[in-house]
Swiss-Prot record:
It catalyses: Specific for a P1 residue that is hydrophobic, and P1' variable, but often Pro; Endohydrolysis of RNA in RNA/DNA hybrids. Three different cleavage modes: 1. sequence-specific internal cleavage of RNA. Human immunodeficiency virus type 1 and Moloney murine leukemia virus enzymes prefer to cleave the RNA strand one nucleotide away from the RNA-DNA junction. 2. RNA 5'-end directed cleavage 13-19 nucleotides from the RNA end. 3. DNA 3'-end directed cleavage 15-20 nucleotides away from the primer terminus; 3'-end directed exonucleolytic cleavage of viral RNA-DNA hybrid; DNA(n) + a 2'-deoxyribonucleoside 5'-triphosphate = DNA(n+1) + diphosphate. A motif (Nuclear localization signal) lies at residues 26-32. Residues 483-499, 1454-1463 have a biased composition (Basic and acidic residues). It comes from Simian immunodeficiency virus agm.grivet (isolate AGM gr-1) (SIV-agm.gri). The lineage of its organism: Viruses, Riboviria, Pararnavirae, Artverviricota, Revtraviricetes. This is Gag-Pol polyprotein.
Length: 1472
């Protein structure tokens, strides 16, 4: 057996091979383990011959013992193997590895040493915070002494780096070997691997970055240090470059506070090592794919090697193992693995796929199978043990079987268990439903409240693993209010309200709720009976001392009255609660715990069910949509347990229903912790379902504002608990809400549920709840006259002018009627006393406020996210705090996309922020609305384009607001004021339903001058003038009539889009002109420059004529400020004029001055286009609805004209112009899909590279029709690869047969896979849009489909090359044919060899490969060199394979036939 090469031989080796690797395991030790151990010895500087003796094994164990607790898996395996070999040498009989390790540790007292070392903390040699004993720093005589690393440790580190070649194993090896090391020791480990300079350079860069970050965050104190005080370590000190060993020891053990510099430095090095490992292992696990003939075992080895190098959490790696390992397998293995079911083990996958591989692998496998078969024949089948005696299932006797029984056949009911009838004839109902359970076998499991209180909205963490199984027969009694105090915490002063909150128990009702209680120290099994008033115990189960006082009592029951003894003040322990109460002792058939004990324990009978009085709202999916079918992503153990408990309770309350695999839909579910970090919240990712669900209209368009509430004497705020879960969901829609809770480690199938109520996160829940609650409240309002109810979602504001008693009565009526409808209002969410928290506001009897605003100080780091939050707080505060500005603060965020990007405050923003800090420090209050008083809105200008306004009644502020929106680039204050007043009026109509009287800071004359011409820009109500310091005024105005006697300036400008060059100028009626050349400009900028030139060169009064609507729109609005510097200069020039008349004329209409100036500025810049074919293009578009690119090419129209024709067509403006693109795909790849329209099936095939489509209407979506369409496609176009979804028609045998016959590779798409059928899905949408545009022109859908296909293929141009899909496809096929032909010609050239001479060297060299042949020279390639040789020095011959040696020039000249053949080929090559 090869024992000569191992540490054991003979009988010792036989004993070794009988020892099991694990307790009760099947695998045993083999000789290969000994060979492996011998090789591993070198890593630790030990000789393999030490394994041959007991003393040698003892030395190995002494070396490995300190490293074993923190070592890698390989090190632990070596330690275990040495223990087994030691036991064999010592003739200690052991059965498995675990027993051998225990034997060795007991023999050498290793366990006692560790235990004693743990007890003696003062004598420990390990620094604080560690567990390993392998430390270079030891405590000797209460002083810390450094011991250098041993050569064995350094040798092991070097061998690891050399053997693993910076694999993923290097990082854990470094962690194990450097445990407890100082920075000096870590640098020593890095120095011994000095040959790897590239890796060390990366490590150095990471260490330098971390050291710099340390210095930035740990700045040394200012000034000199006191005498004897230890300085704080810097980044270079931690790295060991500027610190000594003694300083490192002092910082680690004696400093106050202590700084473990060694551990900190190890973290930096580990970060660098991870970066090095990632660089040396560039192949990602996502790129690992199994080859077509690669054995599955080799693929798994490569996959796990790449997985170890991934720097990802373990849960992510688990997910990669579960999904990517199967997803990236080849088709043969993938087909086998899918047949294994959900989440197979790796061992099952390896066994199932062991036959997949190339011929060599299959031959090797066949040899192994044949050898195993021969061994089985030699060994023979194993015999089974003796069979037991036969037993009859009819009479129960031994010796014969049921079919041989002579006794009459007994019929047994499987429902009640009785003999004589069958289950279908049973009249007894459920079997043993009221049977008294034996006391010893019905103990209910303990379930604590702190672990039990899970709900959809929150659950405690962690959940209890000993949960009780649920029942399908009846929902259990659930107690979920409050929390249970610990044993002995209850006091006599506990109030009834406090006692009612302690719930800790859940019992299923599929059997009697029996519970073990302790009465005066005696355990008693009793029935928890919520229908019994008293607690009655049988005399045989409970005995009290004779001297304990009692009194006689008669209690009534179903069978009549019974005499009992009543003992008072008896102590009863139920779960973790101790209750004192009365106990009755008598002849009761069963022990009963009544309500007198259960009520003190805080138990309730909760039946959470959906209300049957609320009608379901019918909901459906969008047309053509289907429900979500998404895979559940991996979850951690604690999340799975939390979700299990949440769903179990919701199922018991009727909010969820358990379903199976028959429901094909699924949505991912996950859990997050609430803010208090003690409870869990379940979240379902309904994004895909929301896309497919019909659209809803939000019936409540906004949040009610407290300024719109009227002042009332009595106010109560209540909240509807579990609002959504009380409203039933449409039964037909429930199947789409299905989700799955996976099992840990995939130990079983997931638990699937679907919602019976409105789920959170679904887009229909808010609308349905709002509408349902509104209908319920309408009925409630009729029963509560004088009570005003304001509702937003589940928050209710109840107010009245009644006295307190009557108001509370009406509130109780509201709560009672809501409860009748299934809407519960918990007591803890009822607010009866001020201040009332409502919708983020604080309501008081006479005022309302918001919570105190605390703005963070300016010092410190500011990111985009932090500033966004501050701006949100300021916007919220601006409804009550006047004067808040955020313009400059928001300006800092422009162009910033990364939320964590740091922001540097500008001076303006900093001043603005400090001003806001001063504003929010003062408390502001708002009043309530009085409908009898006048509503006034006052506006103030704050400067810098920011405005503020207040709504008041008789001087009391209702609310405030601000306005800083600039809608146009060029604007003036009057236009902004008009928009602001419009906003104020909309806000007043929304909150109070009436218009206010608006007070504006503008002069009446100024406003009228502007308003008479521009009244159409907006509508505003009546307003009045208010004298404030910042009055709005017009800085200039334009006259309406031409100024007589003044010169007229015709202005124009032109620019080229290509060169960005332009001209601007003017020409006056009196012959004055000026032309100016411009660079890097546009048409609009040139037009504005011309106006500016005319204003500069004219007098105080001027007439200006332009043909630019852009210029007219800007200047006629009289802007006073602009973001454009050029417009700002024009405004300044206008202010200097006394009168300006501005007129517009159409261009190119032969108008005198306009035509002349247009020719002057257009010369050399642009061409005047004469658009004669516009009408022809319009007619063609009305017929085919082609896109603008097609009209540009066919009719020679400018882009802007062609786009205008498309924009004017109402049928082309549904979703705008689609943008065409091209995906990366081969030329013979097609995608196919079926879509539905008007109740018919349209099958569509798209050529991925060109976008060309084939489509037709088919009778049925079957495999036969799909295969027939595929044959048509194959007859017309080359198809080598077909990609579809995994629908039944595409995966049918008919399609598979056509693919086999046509040699077509067929693949199917997977959700979230890059190879999904995205192209054909996009074409489906485009085809439907074209059909909708031409549907009125066709009688039948079949005709419309063919017409739409023609339009798409031939009339829509764009994408690659700017041509149509049909042109692109033909072009690609032609190009492919040309390339194939050219490749054949190139191949002919490559079949020739060239012998050549260089310079004056007479020796012929070669042969070289011919690349190109011209008239005067040839291009050849010899080895890696490419050379150009004159024709006179080159001889070309045809390569016929092996030939005789040619040693003369004549032999080469003799092959003139080949040269002639090359002449023709070279001509073709020259043309190319």
């Amino acid at each position: 057996m090869g024992g000569g090469h191992s540490a054991l031989s003979g009988r010792s080796l036989d004993t070794f091979e009988k020892i099991r690797l694990r307790p009760n395991g099947k695998k045993k030790y083999q000789i290969k383990h000994l060979i492996w151990a011998g090789k591993e010895m070198e890593r630790f500087g030990l000789h393999e011959k030490l394994l041959e003796t007991k003393e040698g094994c003892q030395k190995i164990i002494e070396v490995l013992t300190p490293l074993e607790p923190t070592g890698s898996e390989g090190l632990k395996a070596l330690f275990n193997l040495c223990c087994v070999i030691w036991c064999i040498h010592a003739e200690q009989k052991v059965k498995d590895t675990e027993e051998a390790v225990v034997t060795v540790k007991q023999h050498y007292h290793l366990v006692d040493k560790n235990e004693k070392a743990a007890k003696k903390k003062n004598e420990t040699t390990a620094p604080p915070g560690g567990e390993s004993r392998n430390y270079p720093v030891v405590n000797q005589n209460n002083a810390w002494v450094h011991q250098p690393l041993s050569p064995r440790t350094l040798n092991a580190w070097v061998k690891c780096v050399e053997e693993k070649r910076w694999g993923a194993e290097v990082v854990p090896m470094f962690q194990a070997l450097s445990e407890g090391c100082l920075s000096y020791d870590v640098n020593q480990m890095l120095n011994v691997i000095g040959d790897h300079q590239g890796a060390l350079q990366i490590l150095k860069e990471v260490i330098n970055e971390e050291a710099a970050e340390w210095d930035r965050t740990h700045r040394p104190p200012a000034g000199p240090l006191p005498a004897g005080q230890l300085r704080d370590p810097t980044g270079s000190d931690i790295a060991g470059t500027t610190s000594s060993i003694q300083e490192q020891i002092e910082w680690t053990f004696n400093a106050n506070p202590r700084i473990d510099v060694g551990a900190q430095y190890r973290k930096w090095v580990i970060l660098g090592l991870q970066k090095v490992v990632q660089m040396y292992n560039p192949q990602k696990v996502l790129d690992i794919r199994q080859g077509p003939k690669e054995p599955f075992q080799d693929y798994v080895d490569r996959f796990y090697k790449a997985l170890r190098a991934e720097q990802a959490p373990q849960d992510v790696k688990n997910w990669m193992t579960q999904t990517l390992l199967i997803q990236n397998a080849n088709p043969d293995c993938k087909l086998i693995l899918k047949g294994l079911g959900m989440n197979p083990t790796l061992e099952e996958m390896l066994i199932a796929c062991q036959g997949v591989g190339g011929p060599q692998h299959k031959a090797k496998l066949m040899v192994e199978m044949m050898s195993n078969g021969q061994n089985m024949v030699q060994v023979g089948p194993q015999k089974k043990g003796p069979r037991g005696p036969l037993k009859c299932f009819n009479c129960g006797k031994f010796g014969h079987m049921q079919r041989e029984c002579k006794a009459p056949r007994q019929i047994k009911c499987f429902k009640c268990g009785k003999i004589g009838h069958m289950a279908k004839d049973c009249k007894n109902g459920q079997a043993n439903f009221f049977r008294v359970w034996p006391l010893g076998r019905s103990e209910t499991k303990k379930f604590c409240a702190i672990q039990r209180r899970h709900s959809w909205s929150g659950t405690n963490s962690p959940p209890n693993g000993n949960s009780l199984r649920s029942s399908k027969e009846a929902p259990p009694a659930v107690c979920r209010e409050g929390t249970a105090p610990e044993r002995g915490e209850r006091t006599d002063k506990e109030t009834e309200g406090e006692r009612s909150g302690g719930c800790f128990l859940e019992l299923p009702l599929w059997r009697r709720p029996m519970k073990r209680v302790i009465i005066e120290g005696t355990p008693v099994q009793a029935l928890l009976d919520t229908g019994a008033d008293d607690t009655i115990i049988q005399e045989k189960d409970l005995h009290f001392p004779p001297h304990k006082p009692w009194r006689s009592k008669v209690v009534g029951g179903i069978g009549g009255g019974i005499h009992v003894k009543e003992y008072q003040g008896v102590q009863v322990q139920l779960e973790d609660k101790i209750i004192t109460g009365s106990i009755l002792i008598g002849s009761t058939p069963i022990n009963i715990i009544g309500r007198n004990i259960l009520a003190q324990a805080g138990m309730k009978l909760v039946m959470g069910v959906l209300s049957s009085q609320i009608e379901e709202t019918k909901v459906q999916l969008k047309e053509g949509k289907d429900g979500p079918k998404l895979k559940q992503w991996p979850l951690s153990r604690e999340k799975i347990e939390a979700l299990t408990e949440i769903c179990k309770q919701m199922e018991e309350e009727g909010k969820l229903s358990r379903i199976g695999g028959e429901n094909p839909y699924n949505t991912p579910v996950f859990a997050i912790k609430k803010k208090d970090k003690t409870q869990w919240r379940m979240l379902v990712d309904f994004r895909e379902l929301n896309k497919a669900t019909q659209d809803f209209f939000e019936v409540q368009l906004g949040i009610p504002h407290p300024a719109g509430l009227q002042k009332k004497k009595q106010i109560t705020v209540i909240d509807i608990g579990d609002a959504y879960y009380s409203i039933p969901l449409c039964k037909e829609f429930r199947k789409y809400t299905a989700f799955t809770i996976p099992s840990v480690n995939n130990t079983g199938p997931g638990i699937r549920y679907q919602f019976n109520c409105l789920p959170q996160g679904w887009k229909g829940s808010p609308t349905i709840f709002q509408n349902t609650a509104a209908n319920i409240l309408e009925e409630i309002k009729r029963h509560t006259p004088g009570l005003e109810i304001v509702q937003y979602m589940d928050d209710l504001w109840l107010a009245s002018d009644h006295d307190e008693t009557r108001h509370n009565q009406q509130v109780d009526i509201v709560r009672k009627m809501l409860l009748e409808k299934g809407l519960e209002t918990p007591d803890k969410k009822v607010q009866r006393e001020p201040p009332w928290e409502w919708m983020g506001y604080k309501l008081h009897p006479n005022k309302w406020t918001i919570n105190k605003i605390e703005l963070p100080p300016l010092e410190g780091e500011w990111t985009v996210n932090k500033i966004q939050k501050v701006v949100g707080v300021l916007n919220w505060a601006s409804q009550i705090y006047p004067g808040i500005k955020t313009k400059h603060t928001c300006a800092m965020l422009r162009g910033k996309k990364n939320l964590l990007e740091e922001i540097v405050w500008t001076e303006e923003a900093e001043a603005e922020y400090k001003n806001n800090q001063g504003i929010v420090q003062e408390t502001q209050e708002g009043t309530y609305y009085d409908p009898l008083k006048e509503l006034i809105a006052t506006v103030q200008k704050q400067g810098e384009g920011q405005w503020t306004y207040q709504f008041t009644q008789e001087g009391a502020v209702l609310k405030v607001g601000r306005y800083a929106k600039q809608r146009e680039t060029h604007t003036n204050d009057l236009r902004t004021l008009a928009h602001l007043v419009q906003k104020i009026c909309k806000e007043a109509l929304t909150i109070w339903g009436r218009l206010p009287r608006v007070q504006l800071p503008v002069d009446k004359k100024t406003w009228d001058m502007w308003w008479q011409d521009y009244w159409q820009v907006s509508w505003i109500p009546e307003w009045e003038f208010v004298s404030t310091p910042l009055l709005v005024k017009l800085w200039y105005s334009l006259v309406k009539e031409p100024i007589k006697g003044e010169d007229v300036y015709y202005v124009d400008g032109a620019a080229s889009k290509v060169t960005k060059l332009g001209k601007a100028g003017y020409l006056s009626e009196r012959g004055k002109s000026r032309i100016r050349e411009l660079e890097n400009t546009t048409n609009q900028q040139a037009e504005l420059t011309a106006v500016k030139m005319a204003l500069e060169d004219s007098g105080e009064n001027v007439n200006i004529v332009t043909d630019s609507q852009y210029v007219m729109n800007i200047l006629t609005a009289c802007p006073q400020e602009s973001n454009s510097p050029l417009v700002e200069q024009i405004i300044q020039a206008l202010m200097k004029k006394r009168q300006v008349y501005l007129q517009w004329v159409p261009a190119h209409k032969g108008i005198g001055g306009n035509t002349e100036i247009d020719k002057l500025v257009s010369k050399g810049i642009r061409q005047i286009l004469f658009l004669d074919r516009i009408e022809e293009a319009q007619d063609d578009h009305a017929k085919y609805h082609n896109n603008w690119r097609s009209m540009v090419q066919e009719f020679g129209l400018p882009n802007i004209v062609a786009k205008e024709i498309v924009a004017a067509c109402p049928k082309c403006q549904i979703r705008g112009e689609p943008k065409h693109g091209q995906v990366d795909a081969s030329i013979e790849t097609w995608q196919m899909d079926c879509t539905h329209l008007e109740g018919k099936v349209i099958i569509v095939a798209v050529h991925v590279a060109s976008g060309f489509i084939e489509a037709e209407v088919i009778p049925r979506e079957t495999g036969k029709e799909t295969a027939h369409f595929l044959l048509k496609l194959l007859a017309r176009w080359p198809v080598k690869h077909l990609h579809t979804d995994n629908g039944p028609n595409f995966t049918s045998q008919n399609v598979a047969a056509v693919c086999w016959w046509g040699n077509i590779e067929h693949t199917t798409g997977i959700p979230y896979n890059p190879q999904s059928q995205g192209s054909v899905e996009s074409m489906n949408r485009q085809l439907k849009e074209i059909i909708s545009q031409i549907r009125d022109d066709c009688e039948r859908l079949e005709t419309a489909v063919q017409m739409a296909t023609h339009i798409h293929n031939f009339k829509r141009k764009g994408g690659i090359g700017g041509i149509s899909s049909a042109e692109r496809l033909v072009n690609m096929l032609t190009t492919q044919l040309e390339l194939n032909t050219l490749q054949n010609q190139i191949q002919k050239i490559l079949n020739f060899k060239v012998y050549y001479r260089e310079g004056r060297d007479p020796v012929w060299k070669g042969p070289a490969r011919l690349i190109w042949k011209g008239e005067g020279a040839v291009v050849i390639k010899e080895g890696e060199d490419i050379k150009v040789v004159p024709r006179r020095k080159a001889k070309i011959i045809k390569d016929y394979g092996e030939r005789k040696t040619m040693d003369s020039e004549g032999s080469m000249e003799g092959v003139r036939e080949a040269n002639k053949q090359m002449e023709g080929d070279s001509d073709l090559q020259d043309q190319e």
